């Protein structure tokens, strides 16, 4: 009884395997990660502020944001999102992160993981995401 069931299982697996191979052969699947190149080029700007007891420099902040994204989702998403601190005001500890439309959610998700700069605890709080740099600068008080 068990040997008959084993033979039936093997036949079914082979049948499904043959159908799958034929399906993929006919379809000639070309999987593209991003079909529209405009999506990659479309920028998103994340307006944020930093809560910390000490003043934080913009270069250190960008390094920590990039490391947190790499730790959370890996170097592939770091290359896709490519976050950069465009503007950072040290007096008010507000700034703007530039990324693209594909990776801005990954950057937002990684911001809570940026917890420490030079052994000083920090918290990066995103305020708003916008599509234009002009509006982002207006939100932090720059022209």
UniProtKB/Swiss-Prot annotation:
Its EC number is 3.1.26.5. It holds the Pfam family RNase_P_Rpp14. The keyword tRNA processing applies. InterPro entries: Pop5/Rpp14/Rnp2-like, Rnp2-like_sf. Keywords: Cytoplasm, Endonuclease, Hydrolase, Nuclease, tRNA processing. Part of ribonuclease P, a protein complex that generates mature tRNA molecules by cleaving their 5'-ends. It is found in: Cytoplasm. Gene3D superfamilies: Ribonuclease P, Pop5 subunit (3.30.70.3250). It comes from Saccharolobus solfataricus (strain ATCC 35092 / DSM 1617 / JCM 11322 / P2). This is Ribonuclease P protein component 2. The keyword Isomerase does not apply. GO terms for cellular component: cytoplasm; ribonuclease P complex. Belongs to the eukaryotic/archaeal RNase P protein component 2 family. One of its GO terms (molecular function) is ribonuclease P activity. It catalyses: Endonucleolytic cleavage of RNA, removing 5'-extranucleotides from tRNA precursor. One of its GO terms (biological process) is tRNA 5'-leader removal. It comes from the Archaea. Its main location: cytoplasm. Consists of a catalytic RNA component and at least 4-5 protein subunits. The gene is rnp2.
